[in-house]
Design a protein with these regions (language model features):
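Hydrophobic alpha-helical membrane-insertion signals
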Residues: 18-100, 488-504, 511-533
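Membrane-interface coil-to-helix junctions
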Residues: 40-138, 161-183, 221, 274-279, ...
């Protein structure tokens, strides 16, 4: 016991001494400087652009508004606080698998722990603060990587902040996943160096496993770079004995395989979800490859590439200068062959569109060069290596604390001044007619050229590290002013104002909703697709992007709008809304009092009131039915009628199709006693739009551009449109537009019939004594069951597992919802969701972990010893395999696309 206490105190003292040592204090000083530079440079850009906390503007724009912030901040905040499941969500699509979307959105990033610093209602403003925190974290990761070089500490600081202010942060921050990859890359490369130096593989395995689990997409991009750099290091730079190189390749290969196996628990479900999504290709490698070879840069994409030329001037100037210097010395160029090869390969990856596309797996939607973080890393890393080898090593008197503080203050003052001065220049530039053509890309290239010239002069003539730091701070402020300016990617639904309005509605909404009480964005005055995540409510609407291929067809058949990979609330009927437990409607325009009651008016923060209405009708969550399975019809009214008959057991027609009564462009009728609701949908295209007047009043169609849209169809309005509720009156519908009447469909829904059916179901359905929503499942108990099946308004998916009274049963689909076989009497139903690939992933990851732990323990205890002869054989095999793989890799990713590109240029020139 005494020996253990003594050992404990010795370890404690050792840690304490290490933390208080001069080296640790110097590290803390460096980290403090990095924090100040990043914070001041970004806040300067915020200040001049009127971005919070200096104004009402936000860095939110583009995909941040509709995807990144709702999913990556609001939903992750709920996950971190135990309010949501990271793989399955009830907030969207009436319950859906989000394993693929979570991976592509980097929702598992350790940087998301910063969200604990914010309340939920403050997240809209907190995104501006989160940006700074992420950039600081990226800089810190790079700092610890760069410390392997024998240079002055100021070089570590400069390299770190340069990396943090790369295009991954200043351009790709709109899809935050690139920033998360940028944070992990230096840590992974620390692990690579440890493997290379035979100091263990654990560090690499931990962080590369994390990279794959955080985002399988950028994880694969990082893996491509690891292969590229490892081959260059092995075959072009490593002068060690071949036997040593073989062992290094074996260690690296085993470490990569272990990481991939450990990450399987997350990666396998993510890959299955991604591959099944409608957006994914056919999975044919040859087709994808041939398509990629024919890729060409569009003007928009190339303008994005130009914008990514930020804060590369210093490392590029250093590389060019020092390589020229190295060329004068015999043998020096050979030392850098691997780095030069990688730089050239990455340069080709930006210039040749097919190579760029292959880095992304052969396809992508906008956002080119998502591997820009790799380019920034390689340039800074190479520049540091060259600086280490060619810097002036003359001993100089160390600076006093006062000198260091003065240097920092000067740098920060210059940073602030440069940002404010350049803002005036940028403002004037944006006012020029040429800005519409040249855009920010031209200005970014010009800034890089100017600063490159300054750096060349400083490095060649003075080599004054302080001067370089001061100039760098000025450049960081200048590039930040351009990058964070809220004058781009902010049109229509991509404006931060829409996100702010959704956030305001979430804050001001007083009505509480229970589990399975869904909400509907009727007219999209709150112009936000992912609004349920912001409100923390449940709805159909979502923009997870990677969704089940059945979701869109199922909801479209019921008359709900779909757009690209988005599901929207707009559409449907009062029947389908009631059946799907959509009990609340958000609407800017007044809804019929015969069908809804107003709960409250909610201020959206823009001087407008959004009405929250409650559906007057209600159906039980679980409804008994004799229908086992039902496929959707191609005609929306038929689908609604078939579903009504399946639920009620009646043969009555709920919606009477009167499309044949349209006379030219007019439909007119007399509605008698009994409430009727008129619905419209068209099969016309956007090239043949139609607008609608009902009794002389304009009908508005949901649209992403404006709430005043009158054309059908539109992106948010291409399903069923409610034309009004009528009783004892004449109704005249006028269609304007050159559209064939056969493409227009009208149907009368008998509201009184629906109301009577709802009351009958409530009376005869039996009692639901338990209804509990789990994060990825449901528990319910129903008494007095008299029919064979129970309908549940939950999206059908093969990942659902169901037990009824403890026995496994097979669920079926009724128009994309669930049909559960039950027993007469009392039924206890338990539903659990497990995405495809999860069980296999768990088994693979668990076995790998146990094997690794057991092997490490047995080696430590001496129970097993390394078979040196076996290792030699395995190393030789691994080395040969790696050589073949590397040759094929270089040929497929670089050689063939470059030759194909040059062939195209040659043909164009000849023509």
């Amino acid at each position: 016991m005494i020996d253990r206490e003594k050992e404990y105190y010795m370890k404690t003292d050792k840690i304490k001494n290490k933390l208080t040592s001069p080296a640790s204090r110097r590290t803390l000083w460096d980290l403090g400087i990095i924090l100040m530079i990043v914070t001041v440079a970004v806040l300067t850009a915020y200040s001049v652009n009127g971005i919070y906390p200096f104004g009402s503007q936000s860095i939110a724009r583009g995909d941040m508004v509709q995807q990144t912030i709702p999913a990556g901040m609001y939903y992750v905040w709920d996950v971190l606080h135990g309010k949501a499941n990271p793989f399955f969500t009830w907030n969207s699509g009436l319950g859906m698998n989000i394993s693929g979307a979570v991976s592509l959105g980097a929702l598992f990033s350790p940087l998301n722990l910063f969200l604990y610093f914010s309340t939920r209602s403050y997240l809209y403003q907190f995104v501006n603060i989160l940006m700074i925190l992420k950039m600081i974290a990226i800089a810190y990761a790079m700092y610890f990587y760069l410390r392997k070089y024998d240079t002055e500490r100021i070089a570590y600081v400069i390299g770190s902040v340069l990396y943090a202010f790369g295009a991954a942060s200043l351009v790709h921050f709109q899809i935050m996943l690139v920033m998360d990859a940028a944070f992990l890359l230096p840590l992974i490369m620390i692990g690579i160096d440890r493997i290379f130096e035979d100091r263990g593989s654990l560090f690499f395995i931990v962080f590369f496993t994390m990279a794959m689990m955080v985002n399988v997409y950028t994880g694969c991009i990082t893996l491509i770079y690891l292969l590229l750099s490892a081959g260059a290091r092995t075959f072009l730079e490593d002068d060690r004995d071949k036997a040593i190189k073989k062992k290094w390749i074996l260690r690296l290969g085993v470490s990569v395989v272990v990481s991939l196996l450990l990450s399987a628990v997350i990666v396998l479900p993510a890959l299955r979800s991604i591959m099944e999504a409608p957006r994914s290709g056919d999975g044919n490698f040859l087709n994808t490859y041939m398509t990629a070879l024919q890729a060409q840069w569009s003007d928009y994409e190339w303008s994005m590439v130009e914008r990514m030329c930020v804060n590369m001037a210093l490392p590029v100037a250093a590389i060019i200068g020092f390589v020229i210097l190295a060329a004068r010395s015999s043998g020096y160029v050979k030392k850098y062959r691997g780095h030069i090869f990688v730089v050239i390969a990455l340069l080709l990856s930006v210039i040749i569109p097919s190579v760029e596309l292959l880095w992304h797996g052969g396809s992508r939607a906008s956002w080119p060069v998502r591997f820009i973080y790799v380019i920034s890393f390689v340039l800074i890393d190479f520049a540091m290596l060259l600086y280490q080898d060619h810097r002036d090593r003359e001993s100089k008197p160390s600076k006093t604390s006062t000198d260091r503080w003065l240097s920092v203050v000067i740098s920060l003052v210059v940073c602030i001044a440069a940002g404010r001065i350049f803002y005036k220049i940028y403002e004037a530039y944006c006012g020029q007619a040429a800005y519409a053509t040249l855009g920010d890309g031209f200005l970014c290239l010009l800034v890089e050229a100017v600063f490159a010239g300054i750096y060349v002069f400083l490095l060649k003539s003075h080599r004054n590290r302080l001067a370089v730091l001061v100039v760098l701070c000025a450049q960081l402020a200048v590039t930040s002013v351009v990058s964070f300016a809220p004058n781009k990617e902010n049109s229509t639904v991509f404006s931060s104002g829409y996100l702010e309005q959704a956030n305001n509605v979430a804050k001001n909404m007083e009505t509480e909703t229970e589990a399975f009480e869904r909400i509907k964005n009727t007219d999209y005055k709150i112009d936000h697709i992912h609004y349920p995540l912001v409100l923390g409510k449940q709805a159909i609407s979502n923009y997870w992007h990677v969704i089940s291929p059945d979701l869109q067809p199922n909801f479209s058949a019921l008359g709900y709008s779909i757009n690209w990979t988005q599901l929207l609330d707009a559409g449907g009927t009062i029947f389908s809304d009631t059946l799907l437990h959509i009990q609340y409607d958000l609407s800017y325009r007044e809804l019929p009092g015969s069908m809804y009651r107003l709960c409250e008016n909610i201020d959206n923060g823009n001087g407008e009131q959004i009405g929250l209405y409650q559906n007057n009708l209600e159906l039980p969550f679980a409804i008994q039915t004799d229908t086992q399975e039902l496929a959707a019809s191609g005609e929306k009214f038929d689908t609604q009628n078939a579903l009504y008959q399946a639920i009620t057991g009646s043969s009555d027609t709920l919606i009477r199709d009167v499309s044949a009564d349209i006379n030219g462009s007019v439909y007119s009728t007399q509605v008698g006693a009994g409430r009727k609701v008129l619905y419209f949908y068209g099969t016309n295209s956007t090239e043949q739009p139609v607008s609608i007047l009902v009794n002389g009043e304009q009908i508005y169609i949901p649209n992403s551009d404006t709430s005043e849209n009158i054309s059908y169809p539109k992106d948010f309005g291409n399903g069923l449109i409610c034309l009004g509720s009528f009783e004892n009156e004449t109704v005249e519908v006028q269609f304007s537009g050159d559209v064939d009447a056969s493409l227009l469909h009208l149907g009368w829904l008998d509201y009184d019939m629906l109301k009577s059916a709802a009351e009958s179901i409530q009376k005869d359905n039996g009692d639901i004594t338990l209804l509990k929503q789990k994060h990825a499942g449901v528990r319910l108990k129903i008494e007095n069951v008299t029919k064979e099946y129970v309908f549940l308004p939950i999206s059908y998916d093969k990942g659902w597992r169901c037990k009824v009274n403890g026995k496994k049963v097979t669920i079926r689909s009724i128009d994309g919802m669930m049909s559960v076989p039950v027993e007469k009497g009392s039924d206890s139903i338990v539903l659990k969701y497990s995405p495809s690939g999860r069980k296999a992933g768990i088994v693979i990851s668990l076995i790998t972990l146990l094997v690794c732990l057991a092997g490490a323990y047995l080696l430590k205890k001496g129970k097993i010893t390394q078979d040196q002869k076996g290792i030699v054989i395995l190393s030789s095999v691994a080395y040969e395999i790696f050589g073949i793989v590397y040759a094929v890799f270089v040929a497929v990713l670089f050689a063939v696309p470059v030759l194909y590109y040059l062939k195209g240029i040659l043909i164009s020139t000849q023509q």
